[in-house]
């Protein structure tokens, strides 16, 4: 990282990784799980901060995965590898934020992941996404790591 910095690569998207043992969150399992996203889910993502490139990465994922929604108000993607469920692209519609949908979808994900062999739940967000960080901290998830990208200027 230091060498990249010295070569003129700029730090972008500093991120924090949260995690917890899945049994601490897996309480329910009644969400709508899909093998591919429906039109409403894609629309919610595209109106948020998830672009087509990210959606294509999700589609190409080769491990056990699912797309989850709560009435197309909240959506997320989760994939399991080595008993770790990694949540990606959690999005709650702007008008429905701060109403508990983030917590509910994370519980749904944990329930699905637990039934599919995961023992640990993890999620990554950029450092300045304070609503997401607040949700994960409220869920008693611990900060377990950090990372960032670098790009050449």
What residue ranges belong to the model's regions?
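A structural microfeature
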Residues: 13, 72-74, 145
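Short acidic/polar active-site loop segments enriched in Thr and Asp
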Residues: 10, 83, 119, 142
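Conserved acetyl-CoA-binding loop-helix of GNAT-fold acetyltransferases
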Residues: 92, 98-111, 115, 134, ...
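Conserved beta-strand-loop-alpha-helix junction that forms the acyl-donor binding cleft
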Residues: 1, 123-133, 150-153
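Acyl-donor-binding surface of acyltransferase catalytic domains
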Residues: 1-35, 150-152
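Conserved GNAT acetyl-CoA-binding A-motif
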Residues: 113-124
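Internal catalytic-core helix/loop-beta-alpha segment
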Residues: 36-64
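A conserved beta-strand-loop-helix scaffold within acyl/acetyltransferase catalytic domains
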Residues: 56-94
């Amino acid at each position: 990282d230091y060498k990249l910095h010295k070569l003129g690569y700029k730090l972008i998207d500093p991120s924090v990784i949260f995690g917890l043992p899945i049994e601490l969150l897996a309480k329910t399992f009644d969400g709508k799980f899909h093998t591919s996203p429906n039109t409403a889910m894609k629309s919610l993502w595209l109106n948020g901060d998830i672009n087509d490139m990210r959606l294509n990465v999700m589609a190409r994922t080769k491990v056990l995965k699912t797309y989850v929604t709560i009435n197309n108000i909240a959506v997320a993607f989760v994939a399991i590898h080595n008993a770790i469920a990694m949540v990606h692209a959690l999005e709650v519609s702007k008008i429905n934020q701060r109403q508990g949908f983030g917590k509910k979808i994370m519980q749904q994900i944990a329930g699905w992941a637990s039934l599919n062999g995961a023992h640990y739940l993890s999620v990554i967000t950029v450092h300045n996404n304070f609503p997401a960080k607040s949700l994960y901290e409220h869920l008693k998830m611990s900060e377990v790591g950090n990372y960032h990208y670098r790009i050449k200027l």
